Design a protein with these regions (language model features):
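Structured, active/binding-site neighborhoods that engage oxygen-rich ligands
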Residues: 1-332
Length: 332
């Protein structure tokens, strides 16, 4: 493995003022930044504050664990790709588990002595990445066990929340692999912490939507249709937010936001607003993060407020991790 640092500088990527075919790199950046922007929007909404503030100055905004878990998913994939690009076979799922253990350590938690203690990487040293608010309970409890959950041996077959769903976008951003492998990576990573199919299937559906937009270049209708074999996500009817219900809220937000001929940034804002309205109580950050990821994968950085392309803090770290993934997948 060559290094643990994102390749390239963290200066803002150029905006695209005129519509046209989007490059893969722009869709990756748009997806990851859009997810973080949606997360910040949902956090403000959940706190009873004006969520539009998330779209003006993102440098010091709070985010939930949706953003940090997504970035640690990227880092786990980047580490596996670093090994592979150096000619060394690596277990992608093990790399992701180690990344999530590092995320757990970042939350101030301490796995049991028998758990691996992976060394810090570049992401762990970034003080600008604030500890995510309200870390997913199922994720924390599974990682605190010190055991590596698998699809055949789940740690908790009852864990059906959205903790695996919210971190699954990066699997849809890896090019040059078949869709079946992207789905396998998503499901194996979801099973590290969530044992119920109600949690893992929506994660695969979401990464499939992201892949259809960012890799396959489908339009929104085609991307949503490409995951139709798993069935449309259903709205929440239980007291606790579910993965399927939260994905349903995000998709409804995106459909509402794109129902107009407005510019991409306005569609982005509308999608976030509708997603948090449709979400179950307490699920606003996750639903808005998912909607933001879809909109970013669809429109690239055209969807984002300009501040996200130049701001310090969390957006700068997201940009760096996006470029690290791009570097390892394309050599650019």
């Amino acid at each position: 493995m060559t290094n643990d640092s994102p390749t390239g500088n963290t200066s803002p990527a150029p905006a695209h003022p005129t519509p046209g075919p989007l490059e893969y790199e722009d869709r990756v950046l748009g997806c990851l930044l859009g997810s973080a922007a949606g997360d910040a929007y949902g956090v403000l909404r959940a706190a009873g504050r004006d969520p539009a503030g998330a779209l003006r100055d993102p440098s010091t905004l709070a985010v939930s664990s949706a953003t940090s878990l997504t970035l640690y998913t990227v880092d786990g994939l980047v580490e596996a790709l670093e090994w592979a690009n150096d000619g060394v076979a690596a277990d992608e799922t093990a790399c992701l588990w180690l990344a999530y253990l590092r995320w757990l350590r970042r939350q101030g938690e301490h796995p049991p002595p028998h758990a691996p203690a992976p060394p810090d990487r570049w992401l762990d040293r970034q003080t600008g990445l604030l500890t995510g608010q309200r870390p997913d309970r199922d994720t924390v409890q599974a990682l605190l066990s010190g055991e590596m959950g698998t699809r055949s041996r789940p740690l908790d077959p009852r864990s059906a929340g959205a903790g695996a769903l919210v971190r699954s976008a990066p699997f849809g951003l890896v090019p040059r692999i078949p869709a079946s492998m992207a789905e396998r990576l998503t499901l194996d990573a979801a099973a590290l912490t969530h044992g119920a199919e109600e949690a893992t299937a929506p994660a695969a559906t979401y990464s499939g939507i992201i892949r259809a937009l960012a890799i396959d270049g489908l339009d929104l209708a085609g991307a949503l249709g490409s995951s139709a074999e798993t069935g449309p996500p259903a709205a929440d009817t239980s007291a606790e937010p579910t993965a399927a219900g939260t994905l349903h809220a995000a998709v409804q937000g995106v459909l509402a936001g794109t129902a107009t001929d407005a510019a991409p940034q306005e569609q982005f804002t509308l999608a976030l607003a509708h997603a948090v309205e449709a979400a179950a109580p307490g699920a606003s950050p996750v639903a808005a993060s998912l909607a933001g990821g879809i909109m970013g994968a669809r429109h690239g950085t055209n969807a984002l407020p300009g501040a996200y392309l130049s701001s310090s803090g969390t957006p700068e770290i997201v940009r760096a991790m996006a470029r690290a993934l791009i570097s390892q997948t394309t050599g650019a």
